[in-house]
From Swiss-Prot:
The keyword Membrane does not apply. GO terms for biological process: negative regulation of DNA-templated transcription. It comes from Xylella fastidiosa (strain Temecula1 / ATCC 700964). Residues 49-139 form the ATP-cone domain. This is Transcriptional repressor NrdR. GO terms for molecular function: ATP binding; DNA binding; zinc ion binding. It holds the Pfam family Zn_ribbon_NrdR. Keywords: ATP-binding, DNA-binding, Metal-binding, Nucleotide-binding, Repressor, Transcription, Transcription regulation, Zinc, Zinc-finger. Belongs to the NrdR family.
Length: 177
């Protein structure tokens, strides 16, 4: 690999670390000529499906567009970078696991919305408002009401979960079980 500072073609690896998920290797490199150090990231490159756009056009999957979607939706939101990266990997994983050579862009959008819904509700509504072309406040209200009803159902399920856990002899969630 060439040096980012002096363009010399010989650099040596002085440290390598595998990410927690095992999908990325971070390498610390040093230039043989100028002595500058820099880091590189290696990721596995697997073929992703071609995206079929709404107008029928086709284009290669672009991870930068995916990143931009998450960044815009989560701008100024308290979501850790690590969680965003995990959500992006989940979208990419779903696309790979679909096993299709071509995937409609609507599938990508729905995957992004599913991940944003888990990450941050404000980010989810932001993305949904653009993706689904909200026309007025009523569209926002409807989406927020859907989220609220899902949260209510989730909260109602917690006592049921605790009862089941207790019936099988497992400590309750409140007791750190």
């Amino acid at each position: 690999m060439y040096c980012l500072f002096c363009q010399h073609t010989d650099t040596r690896v002085i440290d390598s670390r595998v990410s927690e998920d095992g999908a990325t290797i971070r390498r610390r490199r040093e230039c043989e000529a100028c002595g500058e150090r820099f880091s590189t990231l290696e990721t596995i490159e697997l073929k992703l499906p071609v995206i079929i756009k709404k107008d029928g056009g086709r284009e290669a999957f672009d991870g930068r567009k995916l990143r931009t979607s998450f960044d815009r939706a989560l701008q100024k939101r308290p979501v850790a970078e690590e969680r965003i990266e995990m959500a992006m990997r989940a979208v990419i994983h779903r696309l790979r696991m679909a096993g299709e050579r071509e995937v409609p862009s609507i599938v990508v959008g729905e995957c992004v919305m599913a991940e944003l819904r888990k990450l941050d509700h404000v980010g989810y509504v932001r993305f949904a408002s653009v993706y689904r072309s909200f026309q007025d406040v009523a569209d926002f209200r409807e989406e927020i009401e859907k989220l609220e009803s899902e949260l209510l159902v989730s909260r109602e399920q917690l006592p049921l979960l605790e009862a089941v856990m207790e019936s099988i002899g497992h400590p309750s969630i409140d007791q750190g079980g």
